[in-house]
Each structure stands twice: as C-alpha cells, then as structure tokens.
C-alpha cells in the first residue's frame, strides 16, 4: 500500500512542478533555468520544514510521510532536469550561466532546506 501512496504523491508533485515551472518560465523567460531553480528551491524549503515537523512536532499517519516527502516532493523537485539544463547551457557556450546554475542550485537549495528546518523549529 505504501507504494500506492508514493505513486499518488508523485503524480501530484509532478503536475505541481509542471504548472509552477511553466508559470515561472512564462514570467521570467527561458534564458536561464528559472523554472527548475524555483521548484527546487521551494521543494527544498518544504522538505526541510515538513521533515522537521513530521519527525519532531506533528503526529501524522505513517502513510502521509512517503506520500508527501518521497512521492510529492521527490517528483516536485528535479535533479535530472537541472542536470540537462546545465548541459544545454554548456553546449550553447553559456558557461557563466551554467556555472551560475550549478552554484545557485546546490547552495541555495541546501540553504532553503536548512531554512525550512529553522522555520519548523520556530512553529
């Protein structure tokens, strides 16, 4: 049954990623992978927040954890798209944007997860 919960969360997370990243691209354009960066930042923050709340503060059903954390946020965030977009920037000769994407994605997503944990502690 747990696999079904992960699959349901994955379906919801994938659709949410598609909608949000396309909205960001429509707003900011596609010269830089803003859509992927935005979903990864938001997903990292939510992952840190909910991980802390689920393990330290809230009594949630066990089925909810894999549904939200593994399925939902796992499908919402995307390392493979980040990798492909970075390679595309490199192949087009935009090395500075590729480096910016690598550094900002890794550093800011780890910072976002940490901030999520901090906010969870404050709630």
From Swiss-Prot:
The keyword NADP does not apply. One of its GO terms (biological process) is cellular detoxification of fluoride. The keyword Zinc does not apply. Fluoride-specific ion channel. Important for reducing fluoride concentration in the cell, thus reducing its toxicity. It is found in: Cell inner membrane. This is Fluoride-specific ion channel FluC. It is a multi-pass membrane protein. Its main location: membrane. Belongs to the fluoride channel Fluc/FEX (TC 1.A.43) family. Keywords: Cell inner membrane, Cell membrane, Ion channel, Ion transport, Membrane, Metal-binding, Sodium, Transmembrane, Transmembrane helix, Transport. GO terms for molecular function: fluoride channel activity; metal ion binding. It catalyses: fluoride(in) = fluoride(out). Na(+) is not transported, but it plays an essential structural role and its presence is essential for fluoride channel function. The chain crosses the membrane at residues 3-23, 34-54, 67-87, 99-119. One of its GO terms (cellular component) is plasma membrane. Na(+) binds at residues 74, 77.
């Amino acid at each position: 049954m747990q696999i079904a919960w992960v699959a349901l969360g994955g379906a919801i997370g994938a659709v949410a990623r598609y909608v949000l990243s396309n909205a960001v691209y429509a707003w900011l354009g596609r010269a830089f992978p803003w859509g992927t960066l935005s979903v990864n930042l938001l997903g990292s923050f939510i992952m840190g927040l909910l991980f802390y709340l689920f393990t330290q503060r809230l009594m949630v059903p066990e089925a909810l954890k894999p549904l939200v954390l593994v399925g939902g946020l796992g499908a919402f965030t995307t390392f493979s798209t980040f990798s492909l977009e970075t390679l595309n920037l490199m192949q087009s000769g935009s090395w500075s944007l590729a480096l910016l994407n690598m550094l900002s994605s890794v550093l800011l997503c780890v910072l976002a997860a940490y901030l999520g944990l901090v906010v969870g502690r404050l709630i």
